[in-house]
């Protein structure tokens, strides 16, 4: 029994010291609900979370948030977690990353974003991650990697981009990744990749490019030569078999087996119909730039600025599909539509459509004129139909001026001639009217005009038959007056006008003018 007492004492002491052992950390206080927390690790996976839960201990170094429904990562949601080194956000529903979302995690070494719904990456999405070593972006919906996307990751060693929909990798997309050792671009939609895109990767040791629809043309000639010369060491035996998908004559052939003479390109040709168009104020306009070539050219619209004070200005690219007169132009494969909405005089001027592929570049100008007044909308002709020039040439301005001097010389001359012609016509009409009035004044009035002849023919009312007989030899009508009323006012003999009626009217009486008489029949 004496030996058993110390043994029991040691067992009790061991149970008291067991929570203090480093292998079994105690449960931390302040752990988010339903999460499991340890001294430096917090597990919140598969809890149907929609946001990062509050209350995570500030000293957390490893955070598991996988298999949830987090769709938005706000900029300040991770701000208290400055000590974080491993963050697992895979299999969520993230659609975008705000600029500076990880600014407060300068010690982060590993970031897992696999299996989300990211469609694009902003240039400042990874600002602050100066110590990041591994970045998982596989299994998203990325389609383009723009220039300087990973510029703020100088110590990144592994970049996993497989199983996306990447079809465009810009020349400076991987700029700044001087420490990158592994790049996985397999199972994407890449048709080509430029030599300039891989130049910043001075520490690259593993490159995965398989299962992409490679277009074997002149733009990919460098890749075959690079693999044969020194890039072979970066590729596994599987990755060396880069299979062509285009053109059809080279389909399913390995790039390394295709001769350099078969990797050809067709320079682009470009056409805009009509080359000049007249638009009205306030209307919308769509202009198609048809480009052809192999590979399919990339099309960009630019507005050629008017020089000021003899100094040419830089060209402004236009967004294909978006209105405006500046900004960054977007590339469009083939359709090449220029969209202008609510046209003003500032839209007038010269535009340029540029098509480019690995075989070269081609440009074509387009001239836009704007009517000063609103008119009925004009429709552009169908690009497939024969070219027709726009109808109607009203006062047009190529700049913002509304002055008469802004018009062309031919337009000014036409307006001046029209005004002079109208003035001459008005003078001729006035002269003709005056001449006719003078002729009317000179013509004498016919004899007997304005004279009323009265005949005392009946002693009473007359019939219509008698009225037909009351006409003199010259056809004048003879009217019958009432004898019961005086015929004339009393007129002095010296005031009576002298009048000799014509022959055949001796029995008639001439009534004085400006005197009213009552005549009964």
UniProtKB/Swiss-Prot annotation:
Residues listed as glycosylation sites in the UniProt record: 91, 342, 371
PROSITE patterns noted in UniProt: IG_LIKE (PS50835), LRR (PS51450)
Domain (Ig-like C2-type): residue spans on this chain: 268-371
Keywords, in A-Z order: Disulfide bond, Glycoprotein, Immunoglobulin domain, Leucine-rich repeat, Membrane, Repeat, Signal, Transmembrane, Transmembrane helix
GO annotation terms (biological process): positive regulation of synapse assembly
Cellular localisation: Membrane
Superkingdom in the source lineage: Eukaryota
Regions that span the bilayer: 414-434
Gene3D superfamilies, alphabetized: Immunoglobulins, Ribonuclease Inhibitor
Topology in membrane: Single-pass membrane protein
LRR repeat residues: 59-80, 83-104, 107-128, 131-152, 155-176, 179-200
Protein's name according to its UniProt entry: Leucine-rich repeat-containing protein 24
Organismal lineage: Eukaryota, Metazoa, Chordata, Craniata, Vertebrata
Gene: Lrrc24
């Amino acid at each position: 029994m004496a030996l058993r007492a110390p043994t029991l004492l040691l067992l009790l002491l061991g149970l008291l010291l067991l929570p203090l052992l480093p292998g079994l950390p105690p449960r931390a206080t302040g752990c988010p609900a339903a999460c499991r927390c340890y001294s430096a690790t917090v597990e919140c996976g598969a809890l149907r979370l929609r946001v990062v839960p509050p209350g995570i201990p500030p000293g957390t170094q490893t955070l598991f948030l996988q298999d949830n429904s987090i769709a938005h990562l706000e900029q300040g949601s991770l701000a208290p977690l400055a000590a974080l080194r491993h963050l697992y956000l895979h299999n969520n529903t993230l659609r975008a990353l705000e600029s500076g979302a990880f600014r407060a995690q300068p010690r982060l070494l590993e970031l897992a974003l696999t299996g989300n719904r990211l469609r694009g990456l902003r240039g400042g999405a990874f600002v602050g991650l100066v110590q990041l070593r591994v970045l998982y972006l596989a299994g998203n919906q990325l389609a383009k990697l723009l220039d300087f996307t990973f510029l703020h990751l100088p110590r990144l060693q592994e970049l996993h981009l497989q199983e996306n929909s990447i079809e465009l990798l810009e020349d400076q997309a991987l700029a700044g990744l001087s420490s990158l050792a592994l790049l996985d671009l397999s199972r994407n939609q890449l048709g080509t990749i430029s030599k300039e895109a891989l130049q910043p990767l001075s520490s690259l040791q593993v490159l995965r490019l398989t299962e992409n629809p490679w277009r074997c043309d002149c733009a990919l000639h460098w890749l075959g030569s690079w693999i044969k010369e020194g890039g072979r060491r970066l590729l596994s035996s599987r990755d060396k078999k880069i299979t062509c998908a285009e053109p059809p004559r080279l389909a399913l052939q390995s790039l390394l087996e295709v001769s350099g003479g078969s990797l050809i390109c067709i320079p682009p040709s470009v056409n805009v119909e009509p080359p000049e168009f007249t638009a009205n104020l306030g209307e919308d306009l769509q202009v198609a730039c048809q480009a052809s070539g192999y590979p399919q050219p990339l099309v960009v619209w630019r507005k050629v600025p008017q020089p000021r004070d003899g100094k040419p200005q830089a060209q402004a690219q236009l967004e294909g599909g978006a209105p405006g007169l500046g900004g960054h132009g977007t590339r469009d494969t083939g359709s090449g539509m220029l969209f202008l909405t609510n046209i003003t005089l500032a839209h007038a001027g010269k535009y340029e459509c540029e098509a480019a592929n690995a075989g070269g570049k081609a440009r074509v100008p387009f001239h836009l004129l704007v009517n000063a007044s609103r008119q009925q909308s004009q429709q552009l002709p169908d690009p497939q139909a024969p070219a027709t020039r726009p109808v109607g040439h009203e006062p047009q301005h190529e700049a913002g001026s509304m002055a008469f001097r802004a018009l062309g010389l031919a337009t000014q001359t036409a307006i001046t001639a029209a005004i002079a012609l109208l003035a001459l016509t008005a003078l001729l009409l006035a002269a003709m009217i005056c001449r006719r009035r003078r002729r009317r004044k000179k013509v004498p009035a016919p004899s007997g005009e304005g004279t009323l002849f009265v005949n005392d023919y009946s002693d009473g009312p007359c019939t219509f038959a008698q009225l037909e007989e009351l006409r003199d030899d010259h056809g004048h009508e003879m009217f019958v007056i009432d004898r019961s009323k005086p015929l004339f006012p009393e007129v002095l003999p010296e005031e009576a006008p002298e009048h000799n009626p014509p022959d055949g009217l001796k029995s008639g009486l001439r009534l004085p003018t400006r005197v009213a008489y009552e005549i009964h029949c």
